């Protein structure tokens, strides 16, 4: 595959932003989220106008996908509610997860840190742009977003508003980047040619999308199949019961 200067620039920007993001304290991260949340209300008419543009251009998609694509004031309120919940989360960074002492007296700690740069490929739902941007920023991760072409204008304005909030709060706006070129070559490049920039890829969509991502990705993939039904077995759990559950 030929060198892609557009995607290379996005990758480099994300890597630089992720290094800066490590040093942004919780209070400042939350201030960005609060400002973005206010923008969702202030610019709601512009968001709905962009979404209506997507709806008008939508061709050949089924009713369920069209329903996921369509935004209204209630859905924007739900997006704002999600952001408020994320703001309430305790700081996920710098937490001591476990601690133990070695026989030689050395104390070892397992401490939570950001993953780095996350690539997200998703379909239909514009609210994913809002939710994922907020979650990644809260957890100290830069994110590269590639939404479905059917939601292009909706995703673009939502990512632009988050970048506006970042810039207003003197944070690197490239903590959040949206691939605003529709060519599928950019997706292939993201999956196969950017392991030096991207730490993990997360696909969110149907089985065919997950299958393609897993087949082409040259970086770790956090994917799902028919349902997101994970089981975490704590060290204190009853293992016999856990085996039955799994």
Regions found by a protein language model. Give the residues of each.
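ALDH superfamily catalytic-core signature
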Residues: 13, 124-142, 161-168, 210-246
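Short, charged beta->alpha transition segments
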Residues: 100-109, 122-134, 189
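General beta-strand structural signal in soluble alpha/beta enzymes
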Residues: 95, 145, 177-180, 202-205, ...
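A glycine-rich phosphate/pyrophosphate-binding beta-strand-loop-alpha-helix module
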Residues: 113-116, 123-181
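A structured beta-alpha segment of the ubiquitous adenosine-cofactor-binding alpha/beta core
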Residues: 72, 85, 103-110, 177-195
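N-terminal Rossmann-like NAD(P)+-binding subdomain of aldehyde/semialdehyde dehydrogenases
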Residues: 1-110
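Active-site/ligand-binding-proximal alpha/beta "capping" segment
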Residues: 188-200, 206-215, 237, 244
